[in-house]
Amino acid sequence: MATIIEMPELVLEKVIAFLDFKAVLTLRQVCHDFRNFIDDLNDSKLPDSKFQEIKFVSDDRRISFGLEESKKRFTCISYSKGQRSFCGKTEFFGYSNILNVAVRDMEMILKFQKTILERLQFEFHNVQLYGGSLVHTVPIKLSNMLQKLNRNVKTRTLSIKTNDPSPIMQILRFVDPGALKTIELSSLDGKMEIEIDEFAKTEQWKKADGIHCGFNVLNLNLEDICHFSSCSITLNSITAQELDFLRKTPQKTSDFSFFCVVLSLLHGLKNDFWTVDRYGKC
């Protein structure tokens, strides 16, 4: 008697098309034949997971995914000590390859995502993972995976929290600029300073509607932020000419619904803040 895996490929494709994301992942773990068949399927033949938000965190010697389908439906997958926990089940993989398991799962999750995400969030904490994998290798592996995915991730908001600027470009360049509306960049300890001139050259930056930077920005060319309808930037210093430019910019740009540049002047424990509102008033 023929086994289910010996059924015609067209029949198996129809079966998988009727399953949801979790059911296909479960089927993928049944045997090597199912895993290979599902992994080789064209993305268009996989069901849409329809996630609203995907959150990837490397923190406290572990990696975790937060998958939000709706406000009332939330799934968490965690990886630590060489094991993966998902839907009440734990699998053991060994310390040496748990990072590879997590990245491979992230690739599978993104393959299932057909609709545009509301938010894609990454947090890269300064920790060392089990098996000797340093935290800076996590965004590198993610970047390699996104390149292998061979299509940009569609999300309206991209949020990256890190104390190392390198993951920002490694992730940003693989986000679909046509879908991206808001870029949120922040430091986990509030102390990071970063040069953003390279980010400003990307299509993602140029086509986004809003930018919010929760760290001190260096080498800022004010012309690179004039197209944003919502902008929050922290600077260490600013010239009188630049303040005058900011004052006039909202008046010149018709779609400038809100614009805010924060200037933090540190004098001991004292902070002074300047803002430019949508009416060009400083």
Report each predicted region and the residues it spans:
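Non-core capping and flanking segments associated with repeat-based/extracellular domains
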Residues: M1-C282
